[in-house]
């Protein structure tokens, strides 16, 4: 299970670099933070159950934050195209 957290760290790192190259600095910093978190957690050698609990908590926080952002902060049609 710790290898899967390294895989998550790898992919969030890839997304962070792509966001940075696309001049999306806030998203880039968010994904760099997630990369550091996932790689750090992968080297703790926890039990598989603990990794599942941590991932479940991560998903819960992400879904709540994304829902809050999309309802209260995001401006519909604000892309400027």
Swiss-Prot record:
Keywords: Cell membrane, Membrane, Transmembrane, Transmembrane helix. Its main location: membrane. It is a multi-pass membrane protein. It is found in: Cell membrane. The chain crosses the membrane at residues 27-47, 54-74. Pfam families: DUF2626. This is Uncharacterized protein YqgY. It comes from Bacillus subtilis (strain 168).
């Amino acid at each position: 299970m710790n290898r899967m957290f390294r895989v998550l760290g790898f992919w969030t790192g890839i997304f962070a670099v792509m966001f940075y190259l696309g001049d999306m600095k806030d998203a880039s910093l968010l994904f760099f933070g997630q990369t550091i978190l996932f790689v750090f957690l992968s080297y703790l050698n926890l039990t598989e159950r603990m990794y599942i609990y941590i991932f479940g908590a991560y998903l819960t926080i992400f879904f709540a934050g994304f829902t809050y952002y999309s309802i209260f902060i995001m401006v519909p049609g604000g892309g400027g195209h």
